[in-house]
């Protein structure tokens, strides 16, 4: 037998050579010999090298080849558009296998031809794709089955279509999945398929002009083209998805697991008891206060999912309860047939129909497994596929409660977190429908969302993350994106669908740059949470932190080893501060399991602060500094980045959160927490220079406001930085109405370890209210005792104004003090105020009537109603005590070299620090440094070496020239794009495409 196999292989090779690689065709004797061992295709195309020989039976088709394969396109002949082309290189046969591998690009009406008679134009049979998941089978003479349901092809995907025709039996497979089988094909006219025709194979195009890219074509005897059974892989993918949600294991000695399961069980029991099970019901559970009709859909499916979680989680009192499973399925039927989630119509917010409901729906189907019949699953997945046909299409938002036909936004492609949400649904559908095309599309579609961008939505080189075109959104939309991408990569890992390792690493690197510097005690800084800051939190923490922790652990699962350990160490550091919170706030079993494993893993210590130093996110106008004792953040805006976002009646008073708002965290435990946003004075946010004129709550559809100014940015190096913003409120709108606001100012922050030096200059504007700079506005911790001390003594009055050299908000708790030093004596107003508020007042989409109370100490500098060239200077000293503050003030270590609207500069000799912001487009000179254009610069002196770090904060300069004091003999190093002219002692810096990033010169 072994010799016979070798002989067959040699004959096959000889035949291929004599055919000139048109494709391999075996003789009858060779085929018979081969069949005694294993059936093989008798024809395999070689389209990249040869078009081959073709005959057009019907119409005319143009054919050409290139490295991508064969291209075939029908042409119009009179009124006829149909072409039937048979391949003369393939053997004629009456029964056999015919396989076509092709790239689908949105075409309709194309397919395979078999049993084609070379002499008769009306004797051939075809299996073809029409469109939208509809297929057809038949032959000329009106013998057609034209509405065969099957997979919907997705544009951009490669497919393998196999038709197995054996007598009157037809089977068709797409990517090895059987989707049509008919033991004896009968046509509507009562006749059956002709099974005695001996004929050729080929391609049919009809109904419209189209062009098809065929990668390969094979034909041979029945069974010669193997069908790979991938059902086991789909089961594994489904099990991975299911294991993220529920567990079939239970350990009664694990208290965290016991508590988690008990919580699920209790919630489900209550929901089961309160569910409306009447035969003529109009709802499952009553409409919740504040819910719109479309939001109610998401709520109803969320509750059904909670029932499913209890059903699928071992240890629950409802585990594997058949009655509960029937109740859930009955509820799904009700939502599809009675509440309109049937894939045909919709109303209200697109998000509920395409994201809110589908993810819960899919989770339920994954958990219930075979409790859902194949017939019902097909109904459910067909409905889901109608709302989410692919990850790219988004529905319009329509009026609530009035059903309309599905209306996808034309010429629109989803981006960012919305793309990943939709991709996750497509992945789930692909798993349930065993559709490799959908799974591949889900994976390929998310690559765009983590590829670096230079404008619009997505990740930037510096770690910025933008959503809605110009809103910093790392904390909310960014988290959603990371969760979605993370789940897709985790589920498809170690399968035939896994993403290329290089792309996975790119994603992980983006997560590293974007997230770790923006986390304080496990929570994302509010300055990157967008309108989400106005949402009522769950009991305890805001939830953004826990979400980030769990998402980082998901990413760690598939991250390269070095990043895996880095993320796990970081998460453990933050989780150790409050482990019970993370164990009791898990979103699903996967979160709990990852948390338990991490906290009990002795090899991961979590002993080091994950990020220290400074980080400028120039592409989203955000800055952070992290030291072991405090964290400092800045929220800015420019022509590139919006000042805030309001929409869906959320964040109605976020007007000034981008006006230079300072976030200083120390150990007071309450700053910017759940009681802050409903109670803080929205006109007096810390760090801002503001026109306090009353504004109406933002209730228009979506509000974003950009500045006319481009000068926003700075430089960073280790734990030092220089940051600036040209503030310009001209053009500000309120609910779409242009305001007469005209406030302008130049604001700078010079950042050192333990010192934040704030300068303001060129403050001008007109208002009927007052223009103020808010030195700080601190929420006090009710559990601490506070005093307001100053160089003129303790301040007891609720409202006090006087000239001051320093102020101290003193606490009885370690590292909760805040000190303020004024380089020149400054009139400062000190206000003690108790404020009350609710989240409902600032957010109607996520309302809460709970009243919060906040006790505040506000320090402001008044500039009057018509300032023309006002200025300010102060230093924030987090955690300083009274003795050290007095010493600091007496030493006068901060030297303000310039505080004008042309140049702001600060020198701190002890730290070897010089910071400069030159605002003028034509540059300027300060401290022996001359630039011919606007620049942000920092000089750090260490012994005999000076390091100059600088950037173009306008992000518009192509080149500038820079001269520095000639107190050096050697240029040790300089960044790429810098040249030095010895004759003029001038550096020329190329900032093209720098996007606000820094360059550096080191001299000695």
From Swiss-Prot:
Single GO molecular function: chondroitin AC lyase activity
Keywords assigned by UniProt, alphabetized: Lyase, Secreted, Signal, Virulence
Active-site residues from the entry: 468, 477, 531
Result of knocking out the encoding gene: Deletion of the gene in vancomycin-resistant strain V587 leads to significant defect in kidney colonization in the mouse model of catheter-associated urinary tract infection (CAUTI). Double deletion of hylA and hylB genes in the same strain leads to a significant colonization defect in both the kidneys and the spleen in the mouse model of bacteremia.
Reactions this protein catalyses: [hyaluronan](n) = n 3-(4-deoxy-beta-D-gluc-4-enuronosyl)-N-acetyl-D-glucosamine + H2O; Eliminative degradation of polysaccharides containing 1,4-beta-D-hexosaminyl and 1,3-beta-D-glucuronosyl linkages to disaccharides containing 4-deoxy-beta-D-gluc-4-enuronosyl groups
Induction notes from the record: Expression is up-regulated by 5 kDa hyaluronic acid (HA) in vancomycin-resistant strain V587 cultured in human urine.
Compartment(s): Secreted
Cellular-component GO terms for this entry: extracellular region
InterPro entries noted in UniProt: Chondroitin_lyas, Gal_mutarotase_sf_dom, GH-type_carb-bd, Lyase_8, Lyase_8-like_C, Lyase_8_alpha_N, Lyase_8_C, Lyase_8_central_dom
Family: Belongs to the polysaccharide lyase 8 family.
Name used for this protein in its record: Hyaluronate lyase HylB
Protein source organism: Enterococcus faecalis (strain ATCC 700802 / V583)
Gene: hylB
């Amino acid at each position: 037998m072994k010799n016979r196999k070798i002989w067959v292989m040699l004959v096959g090779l000889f035949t291929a050579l004599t055919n000139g690689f048109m494709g391999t065709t075996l003789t009858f004797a060779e085929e018979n010999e081969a069949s005694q061992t294993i059936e093989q295709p008798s024809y395999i195309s070689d389209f990249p090298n040869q078009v081959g020989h073709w005959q057009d039976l019907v119409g005319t088709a143009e054919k050409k080849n290139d490295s991508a394969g064969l291209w075939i396109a029908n042409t119009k002949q009179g009124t006829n558009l149909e072409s039937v082309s048979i391949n003369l290189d393939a053997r004629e046969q009456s029964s056999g296998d015919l396989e076509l591998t092709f790239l689908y690009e949105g075409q309709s009406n194309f397919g395979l031809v078999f049993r084609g008679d070379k002499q008769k134009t009306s004797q051939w049979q075809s299996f073809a794709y029409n469109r939208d998941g509809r297929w057809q089978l038949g032959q000329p003479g009106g013998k057609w089955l034209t509405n065969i349901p099957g997979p919907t092809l997705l544009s951009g995907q490669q497919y393998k279509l196999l038709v197995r025709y054996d007598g009157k039996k037809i089977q068709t497979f797409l990517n090895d999945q059987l989707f049509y089988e008919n033991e004896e094909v009968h046509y509507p006219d009562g006749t059956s398929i002709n099974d005695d025709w001996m004929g050729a194979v080929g391609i049919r195009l009809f109904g419209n002009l189209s062009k098809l890219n065929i990668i390969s074509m094979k034909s041979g005897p029945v069974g010669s083209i193997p069908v790979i059974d991938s059902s086991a892989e789909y089961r594994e993918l489904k099990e991975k998805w299911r294991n993220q949600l529920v567990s079939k294991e239970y350990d009664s000695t694990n208290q965290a697991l016991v508590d988690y399961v008990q919580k699920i069980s209790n919630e489900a029991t209550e929901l089961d008891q309160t569910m409306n099970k009447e035969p003529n019901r109009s709802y499952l559970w009553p409409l919740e206060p504040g819910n719109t009709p479309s939001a109610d859909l998401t709520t109803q499916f969320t509750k059904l999912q909670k029932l499913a979680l209890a059903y699928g989680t071992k240890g629950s009192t409802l585990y594997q309860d058949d009655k509960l499973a029937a109740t859930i399925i009955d509820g799904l039927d009700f939502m599809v047939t009675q509440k309109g989630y049937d894939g045909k119509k919709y109303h209200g917010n697109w998000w509920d129909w395409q994201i809110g409901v589908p993810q819960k729906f899919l989770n339920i189907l994954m958990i219930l497994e075979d409790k859902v019949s194949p017939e019902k699953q097909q109904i459910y997945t067909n409905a889901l596929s109608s709302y989410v046909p692919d990850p790219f299409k988004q529905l319009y938002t329509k009026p609530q409660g009035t059903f309309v036909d599905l209306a996808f936004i034309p010429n629109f492609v989803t981006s960012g977190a919305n793309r990943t949400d939709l991709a996750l649904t497509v992945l789930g559908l692909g798993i349930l429908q065993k559709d490799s095309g959908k799974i591949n599309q889900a994976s390929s579609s998310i690559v765009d969302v983590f590829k670096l961008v230079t404008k619009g939505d997505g990740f930037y080189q510096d770690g910025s993350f933008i959503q809605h075109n110009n809103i910093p959104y790392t904390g909310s939309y960014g988290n959603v994106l990371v969760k979605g991408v993370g789940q897709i990569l985790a589920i498809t890992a170690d399968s035939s669908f896994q993403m290329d390792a290089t792309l996975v690493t790119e994603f992980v690197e983006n997560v590293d740059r974007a997230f770790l510097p923006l986390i304080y005690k496990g929570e994302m800084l509010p300055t990157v949470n967008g309108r989400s800051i106005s949402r009522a939190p769950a009991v305890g923490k805001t939830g953004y932190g826990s979400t980030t922790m769990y998402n980082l652990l998901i990413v760690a699962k598939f991250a390269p080893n070095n990043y895996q350990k880095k993320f796990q160490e970081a998460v453990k550091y933050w989780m150790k501060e409050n482990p019970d919170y993370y164990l009791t706030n898990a979103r699903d079993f996967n979160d709990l399991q990852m948390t338990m494993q991490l906290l009990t893993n002795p090899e991961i210590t979590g002993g080091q602060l994950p990020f220290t130093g400074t980080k400028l996110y120039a592409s989203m106008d955000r800055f952070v500094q992290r030291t072991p004792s405090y964290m400092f953040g800045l929220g800015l805006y420019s022509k590139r980045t919006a000042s805030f976002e309001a929409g869906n009646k959320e964040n109605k008073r976020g007007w000034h959160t981008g006006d230079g708002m300072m976030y200083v965290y120390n150990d007071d435990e309450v700053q910017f927490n759940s009681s802050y946003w409903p109670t803080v004075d929205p006109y007096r946010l810390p760090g801002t220079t503001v026109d306090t004129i009353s504004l109406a709550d933002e209730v228009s559809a979506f509000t974003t406001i950009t500045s006319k100014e481009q000068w926003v940015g700075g430089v960073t190096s280790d734990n030092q930085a220089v940051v600036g913003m040209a503030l310009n409120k001209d053009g500000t709108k309120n609910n779409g109405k242009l305001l007469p606001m005209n406030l302008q100012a130049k604001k700078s922050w010079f950042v050192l370890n333990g010192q934040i030096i704030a300068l303001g200059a060129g403050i001008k504007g007109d208002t009927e209210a007052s223009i103020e700079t808010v030195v700080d506005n601190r929420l006090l911790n009710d559990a601490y005792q506070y005093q307001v001390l100053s160089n003129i003594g303790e301040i007891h009055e609720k409202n006090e104004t006087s000239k001051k050299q320093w102020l101290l908000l003193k606490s009885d708790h370690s590292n909760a003090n805040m000190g303020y030093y004024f380089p020149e004596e400054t009139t400062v107003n000190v206000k003690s105020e108790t404020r009350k508020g609710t989240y409902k007042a600032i957010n109607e989409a996520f309302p809460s009537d709970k009243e919060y109370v906040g006790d505040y100490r506000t320090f402001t500098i008044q500039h009057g109603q018509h300032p023309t060239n006002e200025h300010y200077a102060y230093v924030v000293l987090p955690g300083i005590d009274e003795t050290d503050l007095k010493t600091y003030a007496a030493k006068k270590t901060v030297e303000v070299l310039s505080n004008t609207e042309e140049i702001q500069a600060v020198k701190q000799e002890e730290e070897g620090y010089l910071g400069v912001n030159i605002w003028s487009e034509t540059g300027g000179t300060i401290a022996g440094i001359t630039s011919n254009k606007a620049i942000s610069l920092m000089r750090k002196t260490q012994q005999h070496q000076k390091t100059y770090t600088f950037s173009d904060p306008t992000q518009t300069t192509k080149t500038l020239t820079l001269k520095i004091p000639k107190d050096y003999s050697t240029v040790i190093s300089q960044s790429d794009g810098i040249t030095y002219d010895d004759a003029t002692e001038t550096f020329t810096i190329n900032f093209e495409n720098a996007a606000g990033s820094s360059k550096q010169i080191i001299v000695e």
